């Protein structure tokens, strides 16, 4: 019997455009689009776009949220992000983005079930505090490459030029509400764009259209691994 798996909002787009698909951690994901070398080159010299929807996302909200994060690390300021180990199995560390005084988004880190459980344990006894798994509620798009910021400027985010690595901003993106997180990868400018799942494919296509002049290419998990793996990043792809 086949195991159940989840589909991202852009799944049908990937299939229509010839992606090689595989199951990764319970999700059907695009591994590549038939030309890994070109995908990696596009990211290194221009801009590439990846469907990162399966990335674990946990919403933490309430007036005691900062107090909870102070149990693990120095809580970031509003509009800032930081990495932190939130449990014994967080590898790599989780990434914490502070959206408002009382609201945070926690990305990655431990398998989301363990991460949600660990955060709820940490929140115990702190009063007004809510921890919610929102992984499937948001589409996540990873935009990487030296032209990524110029591309985003075409889609309307406010104050995009002033955003440095480790910053986050809630802003209209292609006319829908989005969350932008700047998280560079080994010196390569990179952004994570979170929008409501319902708008996922629409925003995906808007980004691709805006990136046409920059030679944008979609890339899959194979290219993502090459660019993010410390040992693989300097290897020539053939």
Tell what function each PLM region has:
Residues 1-238:
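Basic, glycine/lysine-rich polyanion-binding surfaces/domains
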């Amino acid at each position: 019997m086949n195991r159940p798996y989840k589909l991202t909002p852009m799944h049908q787009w990937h299939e229509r455009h010839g992606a090689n698909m595989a199951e990764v951690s319970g999700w059907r994901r695009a591994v590549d689009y038939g030309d890994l070398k070109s995908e990696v080159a596009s990211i290194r010299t221009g801009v590439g776009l990846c469907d990162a929807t399966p990335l674990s996302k946990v919403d933490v909200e309430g007036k005691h949220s900062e107090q909870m994060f102070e149990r693990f690390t120095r809580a970031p300021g509003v509009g800032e992000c930081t990495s932190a180990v939130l449990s014994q199995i967080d590898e790599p560390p989780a990434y914490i983005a502070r959206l408002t005084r009382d609201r945070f988004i926690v990305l990655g880190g431990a398998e989301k079930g363990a991460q949600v459980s660990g955060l709820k344990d940490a929140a115990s006894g702190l009063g007004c505090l809510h921890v919610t798994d929102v992984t499937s509620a948001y589409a996540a798009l990873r935009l990487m490459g030296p032209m990524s910021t110029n591309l985003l400027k075409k889609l309307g985010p406010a104050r995009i030029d002033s955003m440095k690595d480790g910053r986050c901003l809630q802003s209209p993106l292609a006319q829908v509400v989005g969350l932008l997180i700047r998280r560079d990868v080994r010196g390569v400018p990179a952004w994570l764009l979170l929008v409501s799942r319902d708008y996922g494919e629409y925003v995906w296509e808007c980004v691709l259209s805006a990136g046409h002049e920059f030679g944008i290419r979609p890339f899959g998990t194979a290219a993502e691994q090459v660019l993010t793996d410390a040992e693989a990043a300097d290897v020539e792809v053939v």
